[in-house]
């Protein structure tokens, strides 16, 4: 009996601590890769939250949930109820509301927060970017210029271009817009990246595109349209990213894993 008690005491002293509970705010390729890496690491349990921006999101490793939390207050309640140790914000660079809610909820609950955000694209020689601060400014630019426009900003902001009467739009999005498209002249193209240079160049030429509207999402999956625009000397209305909330941030999955290793080194 005493030997068993001693063995149990030793096991209790050396057993692994409880896994770190991670709430991963997903929606990007980096978030999917990070979920897979964390799910394979016994030090962590991960649940990915998908806001529902796309109807058929790609599968993620580990647990997942869909839909919002009900703003900052709802997310704060969830963090407390689920005993979340850290929130990792792996959302799109333009998901400003989600990121702001996460920052405020983490502040309220004293929950650790890390942002994983790929670097933006940088303008290079040959690029003809028309930098704008937001979607309304992009729409105003298109309204002034007119022409045949390749609109690649996702389905949620299309309505901002409804006043562009002198433009024809090739609208590309993963899913059909939930509401009626209010622009007068358009063609809808449903497609999910990654896209390659040859196909993007052919798409622009075939449709006689003379202006592209894009968010500065960064990353390789949709960069081919920027390369194609450069090759064809086409102007790109480039929408700058919103300013993110203050806090710890890293540019890649590997950097996130290194940050987590350092942050929780003493725990394990």
Where in this protein do the model-derived segments appear?
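N-terminal basic/disordered segments at the start of proteins
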Residues: 24-40, 47-51
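N-terminal beta-loop-helix "entrance" segment that forms/cooperates
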Residues: 48-69, 181-186
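Short, polar loop motifs at secondary-structure junctions
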Residues: 49-56, 116-121, 155-157, 173-179
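Glycine-rich, highly charged phosphate/nucleotide-binding loops
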Residues: 63-79, 190-199
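Glycine/small-residue-rich loop that forms an oxyanion/phosphate-binding "nest" at active or ligand-binding sites
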Residues: 86-133
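Anionic-ligand binding region
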Residues: 152-188
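A C-terminal functional module that forms or caps the active site or interfaces directly
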Residues: 182, 186-206, 211, 216-232, ...
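C-terminal functional extensions of proteins
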Residues: 216-218, 225-228, 236, 240-268
């Amino acid at each position: 009996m005493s030997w068993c008690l001693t063995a149990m005491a030793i096991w209790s002293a050396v057993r692994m601590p409880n896994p770190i509970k991670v709430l991963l705010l997903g929606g990007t390729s980096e978030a999917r890769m990070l979920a897979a890496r964390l799910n394979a690491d016994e030090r962590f349990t991960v649940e990915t939250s998908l806001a529902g921006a796309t109807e058929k999101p790609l599968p993620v490793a580990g647990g997942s949930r869909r839909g919002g939390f009900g703003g900052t207050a709802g997310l704060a309640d969830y963090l407390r109820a689920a005993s979340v140790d850290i929130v990792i914000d792996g959302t799109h660079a333009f998901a400003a509301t989600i990121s702001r809610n996460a920052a405020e909820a983490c502040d309220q609950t004293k929950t650790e927060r890390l942002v994983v955000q790929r670097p933006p694209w940088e303008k290079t020689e040959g690029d003809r970017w028309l930098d704008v601060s937001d979607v309304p400014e992009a729409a105003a630019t298109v309204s002034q210029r007119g022409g045949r426009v390749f609109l690649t900003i996702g389905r949620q902001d299309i309505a901002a271009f409804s006043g562009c009467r002198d433009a024809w739009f090739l609208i590309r999005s993963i899913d059909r817009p939930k509401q009626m498209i209010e622009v007068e002249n358009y063609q809808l193209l449903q497609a999910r990246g990654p896209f390659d240079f040859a196909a993007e160049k052919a798409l622009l030429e075939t449709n006689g595109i003379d202006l592209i509207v894009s968010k500065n999402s960064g990353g390789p999956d949709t960069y081919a349209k920027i390369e194609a625009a450069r090759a064809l000397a086409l102007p790109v209305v480039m929408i700058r990213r919103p300013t993110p909330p203050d806090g710890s941030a890293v540019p890649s999955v590997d950097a996130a894993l290194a940050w987590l290793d350092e942050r929780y080194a003493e725990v394990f």
